[in-house]
Amino acid sequence: MQAKKRYILVFVSCAFLAYAYFGGYRLKVSPLRPRRAQHESAKDGGVQPHEQLPSFLGAHDMQELQLLQSNQSKSLDSSKHLVTRKPDCRMETCFDFTRCYDRFLVYIYPPEPLNSLGAAPPTSANYQKILTAIQESRYYTSDPTAACLFVLGIDTLDRDSLSEDYVRNVPSRLARLPYWNNGRNHIIFNLYSGTWPDYAENSLGFDAGEAILAKASMGVLQLRHGFDVSIPLFHKQFPLRAGATGTVQSNNFPANKKYLLAFKGKRYVHGIGSETRNSLFHLHNGRDMVLVTTCRHGKSWRELQDNRCDEDNREYDRYDYETLLQNSTFCLVPRGRRLGSFRFLEALQAGCIPVLLSNAWVLPFESKIDWKQAAIWADERLLLQVPDIVRSIPAERIFALRQQTQVLWERYFGSIEKIVFTTFEIIRERLPDYPVRSSLVWNSSPGALLTLPTFADSSRYMPFLLNSMGAEPRHNYTAVIYVQIGAALGPNAALYKLVRTITKSQFVERILVLWAADRPLPLKKRWPPTSHIPLHVISLGGSTRSQGAGPTSQTTEGRPSISQRFLPYDEIQTDAVLSLDEDAILNTDELDFAYTVWRDFPERIVGYPARAHFWDDSKNAWGYTSKWTNYYSIVLTGAAFYHRYYNYLYTNWLSLLLLKTVQQSSNCEDILMNLLVSHVTRKPPIKVTQRKGYKDRETGRSPWNDPDHFIQRQSCLNTFAAVFGYMPLIRSNLRMDPMLYRDPVSNLRKKYRQIELVGS
């Protein structure tokens, strides 16, 4: 009995000590914790709530988070009565992928009918440019059942209720749209949201629901990552297409220009956005740092001006804005009333490296573009550190940053069309079955818009990425002969001689003959023997066939078009394509030499017949000439090498208006191919040797003998330039010849001896 009491006493004592230790410790670490919270924690296994867990954020990160949360709470308080979108949208929850399985097409709602007063809802110039860019592109469809994306016919760019472009009654207009479905698969473009005095970022004045927002001045707490798209802010005069190219003409040493850092703009003596700009005078020294502001804007600036306004205005008038842009190494891009600024795009175009002073701003297309390669970040709260930041950047990085500003401007930001198409491609890459381009493709020239991932599984097959990836084009070439006249095939015929010459080349892999002539295909026995070289003959739609025609022949359907010579035929398996007219008179050495030159420049057109373009002041139009001058900008594809990717791009990327122009004229396809390649590479073609003529004059009738043929080509050139929005062709005076070409040495020392026998 005594032993039993002792055991009970020991057990009770241990239980009391355990309760005193563990219970007292929990009361000590959370003395103010509510009983209900303690009970819930006990049910969860004693896990502490996240508010009481230790933070691993640094002091700087904690300050940044507090600043963002305070700004967000102010914005929400100012517009808490507005529900502008579904906040938790993702592509998986707010987007119908089944609409996009076949093709990525965009439908635009038709304009609203006139109201009782005979007036239509207003549409701003910029929104009309967006609609025009889509309607004239390959994305557009007039069939809503085939569309993947829907674009509103209602102008939503400016949602500032004080603006003249503000469209009223948007909620009721959205309710009348037949395919609205709470915004699913819709995209809404917006540049300005909110109004004076708080300019709330999420104040659109309507519920966007599940629609994707393509919006300027987006903050990190407002952006639905992986769903919305941040776009740049652009002004009312921004061009629809192409527009001005980057203004950096050279990237020479020294890297620093006259001014190290510059800014010229207005400051706000009251209201949001005034804190940073009102302090910029501390950085201005008038020597290498020029940061000037003015108070002269708005209706009540005189009543609200502060003591510095007069001095700031005098200093402001001393400097020209364009001069500062062109002569500054860095350009400050502070936030204004909203996070974004026009100066961002202006600095990119001028090659003035942007120094961003806008905390929490999500940069345009940030999910794809690596902005560390083109911009510098600064902190609004650490304004006085900006001079030290820009002075610490080495010259080699300044070179790289400046170069990247030009790449991004020309490929993504130079026009409204490029901004809209980039937005579409970002959304397109979110689709489950569409291949995703690498960061290298997005952040190097020519950019993602001109790199179609459906062409090949790997980027190494793109001609302009071979050097950066340390790769070489695949060996050998495919000769493609376009037959338009179809003269009788015999040993003395130009086509017969051409096929025989090609078979002697050491680099040819296959010969493809495109028969577009009205005459029937020659019999198989009339073609020259090609030994081990496969010969394929394709009869283009509309031409006739004879029994047993062609060595390996097939027929396409429909009316033949001259653009069919640039179709991506399955028979073309090599990277190099040798494009030839049926009456070309080149020898084997000329073919081999041109191919070896092309292997060093696989992104360009390399060939023999050269032409030039020029600006005709008397006609205020572009001119085209075949005269022998000291420069050229076109190498005709009647005797030239190029990469097969350009066939794919020509067929699947070019505007349908351009292809229609070629088809209607049955001419100019070679000029269009030159414009395309120059647009992609921003480089001229390459002419080899001094050969001028390349056609057999005994062939007979030829479209080149038609006097209207030349006039037609000038008209085509101007049409192409108008559709591109600028003139892509680039002049060159470079010509490549073989080693010892025309030198007074023995012919036995020369590799390409037949070239020596060719006259001019």
From Swiss-Prot:
Family indicated by similarity: Belongs to the glycosyltransferase 47 family.
Glycosylation sites: N71, N327, N476
Positions of the catalytic residues: D670
Binding residues for UDP-N-acetyl-alpha-D-glucosamine: R437, R565, D581, E582, D583, E669, D670, R713
Lineage: Eukaryota, Metazoa, Ecdysozoa, Arthropoda, Hexapoda
Comp. bias regions, Polar residues: 541-560
One of the Pfam families matching this protein, by short name: Exostosin_GT47
GO function term, MF aspect, one: glucuronosyl-N-acetylglucosaminyl-proteoglycan 4-alpha-N-acetylglucosaminyltransferase activity
Residue spans, topological domain Cytoplasmic: 1-6
Protein's organism: Drosophila melanogaster (Fruit fly)
Gene Ontology cellular component list: endoplasmic reticulum; endoplasmic reticulum membrane; EXT1-EXT2 complex; Golgi apparatus; Golgi membrane; membrane
Protein name in the entry: Exostosin-1
Primary location recorded for the protein, binned into one broad class: endoplasmic reticulum
